[in-house]
Amino acid sequence: MAIRIRISGTLLLSFLFFSTLHAFYLPGVAPRDFQKGDPLYVKVNKLSSTKTQLPYDFYYLNYCKPPKILNTGENLGEVLRGDRIENSVYTFEMLEDQPCRVGCRVRVDAESAKNFREKIDYEYRANMILDNLPVAVLRQRKDGIQSTTYEHGYRVGFKGSYEGSKEKKYFIHNHLSFRVMYHRDQESESSRIVGFEVTPNSVLHEYKEWDENNPQLTTCNKDTKNLIQSNTVPQEVEEGKEIVFTYDVAFKESVIKWASRWDTYLLMNDDQIHWFSIINSLMIVLFLSGMVAMIMMRTLYKDISNYNQLETQDEAQEETGWKLVHGDVFRTPMNSGLLCVYVGTGVQIFGMTLVTMIFALLGFLSPSNRGGLTTAMVLLWVFMGIFAGYSSSRLHKMFKGNEWKRITLKTAFMFPGILFAIFFVLNTLIWGERSSGAIPFSTMFALVCLWFGISVPLVFIGSYLGHKKPAIEDPVKTNKIPRQVPEQPWYMKPGFSILIGGILPFGAVFIELFFILTSIWLNQFYYIFGFLFIVFLILIVTCAEITIVLCYFQLCSEDYNWCWRAYLTSGSSSLYLFLYSVFYFFTKLEISKLVSGVLYFGYMIIISYSFFVLTGSIGFYACLWFVRKIYSSVKID
């Protein structure tokens, strides 16, 4: 029986380890089988640009519109991401190639020309969806071996000049060559879509006479199967001129199975960098672990052993270091209520982050589940309110406070209130740009309802449960008169030690942070939650150990004001995170619009502030455990 349990445990650990390397992919929707001739409806999504970070509705530009535009019901995460999924004029028949289809003919007025030129200037990309697969442009890149990568969406157009002229003109991609890859089931003869690619072209279409019911183009004719040539005259964006939008579609059988169809989108060519990041972080952890072990095993246990013999050896006068402040180390810190609020909020963020990563590792938050990650984070934040209330109330009672209701109110409203205020200002700026990224009033109202209707009551429930629990007893008594803190050496003064303490936690995550920022601001998929989960565990250990080490040095300097110092020591890593985001902005992004820059730094302030609360709470709890551990092992009259 013992052998069976040991084998099962080994298998479980092996499963968890390998699952952390690359997260499982569980499809967001059930597979759909298509027969030959079945209609396929292409949906359009937002227009996006890495140069502005301001998404727009697809029909913001004067594209072909269906008779009635139908909006697909987006989930909360999709709305927050700025997705606007709608129907389109692009329709296919399964397994039937269509060499040339006319979408529509539009006349370009002054406003349309201005919008097209603006979107081309900022390199906007149009996004489409077929059977829950985003359209992509195939790219070949050489990195030792030939590899295929996808670029999400296609460019609205490009700038260029005619031969013999230096004047820059604007050209629009008005002809789309789609390629649909499918995998055929040999038994049922049905097919499943496993790929959706597009090659955009700019073509100045010509025709003799326009027939709305059956337009015949001399440059692209479905009857003669004319093909678009690479040397075709491009379609210029000119006010008062017309643009004919066309498309063709070809179907190609693929060996890729439906369950693996997202692999090309999620292809990662930089696993070695992630492994380097993890090894680098583990070296930091081993270094800190060695220091903590040395403190705990060689110094503390020896000191405690010697200190416990002071009664018989009559050496009480020789007390030095951390032992001298035993009567003050559990003294209630200044602004203890605010500390309780921040620690409780940190527990809430920690719970949300941990559960979100577990769901992501199991594949429930894959990119095919569009908006699922954002939705999960919002909902988990709401329901983790009960742990925030419980933690802040328990800590407040340990500090011998008697205003638990006020602490509960601050826990429920302070942190989310600050975030909501920043978010509201940013949303107002987005509204001013007429971007689809602006959160509609209905969604804003839903967020407020989640906050006031679920999160706040749960915070109060958790706080009530924590208040009813008996107070955590201090292992030693606190003196009535505070001990004077001696003058500290320069390297132990709060400002210096706090800033030093944040370097190592940031160093443990900064490489992974690069990929996260690239995913957020350069519209790339991030699906390496296995690596991220390992880095998150390393971050927890690093925050805990660096705070313990610096706390011990602080106590040895007879400075017993450790509570806020512990929180700020690990929390200061958020300062380095924000400074890195500034560096990333100026070196990796090409944002030129003022509003876009404000949005970037506004969101990075939110992320850095959340990181501060998370890491600060980890450091505080680690220090609390450490201090209680060492002082509970000492005999004190």
Curated annotation (Swiss-Prot):
Entry membrane topology: Multi-pass membrane protein
Motif (Golgi retention signal): 635-637
Motif Endoplasmic reticulum export signal boundaries: 626-631
InterPro entries referenced in this protein's UniProt entry, alphabetically: EMP70, MFS_trans_sf
Transmembrane segments: 275-295, 345-365, 371-391, 412-432, 445-465, 496-516, 528-548, 566-586, 594-614
Lumenal side: 24-274, 366-370, 433-444, 517-527, 587-593
Keywords: Endosome, Golgi apparatus, Membrane, Signal, Transmembrane, Transmembrane helix
UniProt topological domain (Cytoplasmic) ranges: 296-344, 392-411, 466-495, 549-565, 615-637
Family recorded in the similarity comment: Belongs to the nonaspanin (TM9SF) (TC 9.A.2) family.
UniProt domain comment: The C-terminal KXD/E motif functions as a Golgi retention signal, certainly through the binding to the COP1 coatomer.
Entry protein name: Transmembrane 9 superfamily member 6
The species this protein was found in: Arabidopsis thaliana (Mouse-ear cress)
